[in-house]
Amino acid sequence: MDQIRRLLLIFTFFFLLGSVPCLAFECHVLDVGQGQSVLIEADGHYMLIDGGGRDASSFVVSYLRGIEKLDCIAVTHYDEDHYAGIIGVLKTMPCDLLIVPSYAGEGDLYESLAAGALSNGCTIIHGKSGMEFEVGGADVEIIGPTRLDYPSENDKSLCFRVGYGENHYLICGDAEQEAELDMVKSVTEMFSDVYVVNHHGSFTSSMDTFLDAVNPEYAVISCGKGNAYGHPSMETLQRLQNHGVDIYRTDEQGTIIAHSDGYDIWFDHVASDDWVNRPMPVGEKLQEVEQQEKETQAYTYVCNTNTKKFHYPDCKSVNQMKEENRLFTSLSREELLAEGYEPCGNCNP
């Protein structure tokens, strides 16, 4: 009788054990404000895709505390709000592999990234469409960009499709309409259960054709509360709603975690019912923007005296230049070319 009772207890234990979902995979979309950072955890292995901006660096480093090593860190593109936070991670945590875009960045921030990677000792590779690798039991494929001659640096963002069991997750940095359409034309399989919304929910991304191909059940928007860009845009929110997607928002809900056992996906938050964007901030922020506009009207181009390239004042590369290399000028394009300067390949002045 005792033996039968023991057998029943053992059977019950394993039955209950089998009925509890295994937290084998997690996708963390970190609350880094107006930026993006995604942590993939698969069977005790880790991949960090982007690290948010400078202001988020200490938060990201703290969030990763307890992880002994990162299998991989990836930079989708060289926007400050996506890769500045990675520098602190490289300084504090061992990493096997650093994946960077197939074009070079500029300025102090880029040099700090290169120095951090060198100090860390990780292997550095340039990500390209079609590249595949594993993180634990997760399969990771780079599906974009499909070309590198885009005028916008956003469209050059590395795009990662992560598969675990029957579930898939899509993270594409700041990819916009042109890159999205090229992926739809070129990539065989784009379906993803969870879509980390491109470019923080900008109206220039998440077009209907792209959403048709991805066909997500869940979408996570990473953006800062009350950000100056109006992210997420009403147009993008409407498109997501029209596709019947459940949305999660870091600006409203903080860090979002999607759990999976390879079959089912569940979140640590209920889906957001906030289908409106945040209004443009006023007051001090508006005054700051107006002052910047006045300053940029005083000159035509900004030159990098080190690289001998000239840029539009609002080019992202301008903020990354060293102060001693930054030259403001009202010279014409022809005059700058005559002096040996070349136009920036990103802003195409």
Language-model features and meaning:
Residues 8-19:
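Bacterial N-terminal signal peptides
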Residues 2-3, 18-297, 345:
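Non-globular, low-confidence helical/coil segments that flank catalytic cores
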Residues 277-349:
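Mature, structured domains enriched in cysteine- and short glycine motifs
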Residues 6-8, 56, 303-304, 334:
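Short linear sequence motifs
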